Amino acid sequence: MQYQLGTGEFKNWIVAEDSFQPDRLGKCESIMCLGNGYMGIRSATEENYLGNTRNTFVAGTFNKFGDEVTELPNVADVIAMPSRLNGELLDLSKGKVEDYLRTLNLKTGLLERSFVWVSEAGARLKFAFKRIVSMKDLHLIAQE
């Protein structure tokens, strides 16, 4: 994790991950989580990996069964975007990853992730994702 990428008005406001490390997905999902006081979402990647945790929580909702402890229920995953390109599933643990960068701007709440993926078949593709949880509309998660 890097904490020194911001400049100008964003100096000391950017948290960054500059390489894809499947064994550290959970750490980044937690550190870069997004929320607005009503809704919170772990910053899982758009594609699924073994061991990643996809959670979205809504304040004021509770789940209990029998004698179990009451806990926040995990609502539907609206972030997953599994992608197939020429029949190949986007999977950064296969092929080659270049120019990987995931950042969270703590001042604006914008999560961004970009990378170049060279698939096992040799296709070279550039990806860029953006995500935000709205402060103005507490029920809105936006992803591009």
Protein language model regions, located:
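Beta-sandwich/jelly-roll carbohydrate-recognition scaffolds of carbohydrate-active enzymes
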Residues: Q2-E144
